[in-house]
Amino acid sequence: IETLKPKACEIIWKPQIVKEFHTNGMMFQAFDKEENLLETWEVYSVGGGSIMEASESRIGRSEIYPLTKLEDIIKWCKDNCKELWEYVEEYEDKDIWAYLMKIWHSMEKTIDIGLSKTGVLPGTLKYPRKAQMFYKKARREGSRLKNTGLTFAYALAVSEENGGGGIVVTAPTCGACGVVPAVLRSIKEELSLDEEEILKGLAIGGLIGNLIKENASISGAEVGCQGEVGAACSMAAAIATYFYGGTLRQIEYAAEMALEHHLGMTCDPVGGYVQVPCIERNAVAAERALSAANYSLFTDGSHRVSFDEVVITMMETGKDLKCAYRETSEGGLAKNYKIRD
């Protein structure tokens, strides 16, 4: 409304209307002085900050990458003796590495800012920031608990910044923004990785997230939290497996496993805030990503269910979820948790 001033503007909410294209839709209508309709523009927020028009195709777009299935990408990598990050480099613009550097620096900055803050987050939940407490406790622990605690702390730091209106990287969404940065920071410190390696990992994680987005959805409003935290966990698991020296097949297995074991996860934010259960869920998912990576590394990478099959299953499962469990805050924890004074 402020943007369009001094032109008159009215916002009409119609939550009862659910469009087939996507649940998060907005229709702009322009009228002349006589209130005659001049033009209509229908757009949708499909997750991760992406906006699409109703006329665009949701599935199978190949604007940059020619292959839309991980199985086909792995075959390309084997045929060309390439890593997954090299597939990304092959088809992206030359400035991809500068862009990923910007992404990584933003992630690190958000972690540091989140770790520096205490107090409570905005909103009626009065949710306490815990990242700094976790960080301090983890620093005092032995090696086993230390690494776990630091991973928790980094995920909490980013997710708390999101819950407080801070700057985060959608990885793949705001609601799941803590998982990938936490895993990257944790492994960077564990293995003393340089930035060049970090960027390669980011490229792999981005590729996994893009495959999920293009073949299914990363929108909690469309498929529940399996499409947000589940996708983030899958991205982070692939990254971790690459850093730990995993093969192409082990990377695919870790990504598949991380998404598979989030199937059916609901999106039911209490009070409509991206705080409960979202913040804690990011921390747990970061550790689950590392567990998926470790599990895959104990195998030769062979398994029954493919990543591509799980992506399709996730989309179908999300469509079967009631609206109450897809970001509407009408069911689940949002319904049963009573906000306390």
Stretches with model-predicted labels:
Residues 98, 105-224, 332-341:
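Accessory "access/gating" subregions that flank catalytic or transport cores
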Residues 21, 93-107, 144, 148-155, ...:
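Generic structural signal for well-ordered, non-membrane alpha-helical segments
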Residues 92, 108-115, 159, 163, ...:
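Generic secondary-structure transition motif, activating predominantly at the C-termini of alpha-helices
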Residues 22-24, 133-142, 186-188, 213-217, ...:
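Short, charged low-complexity intrinsically disordered segments located at boundaries
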Residues 1-70, 158, 163-171, 176-208, ...:
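Gly/Ser-rich oxyanion-binding loop with an adjacent helix/lid
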Residues 55-61, 70-82, 89-92, 174, ...:
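Short alpha-helical interface patches
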Residues 2-141, 150:
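C-terminal regulatory domains involved in ligand/effector binding and gene-expression control
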Residues 240-341:
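Functionally critical mobile loop/hinge segments
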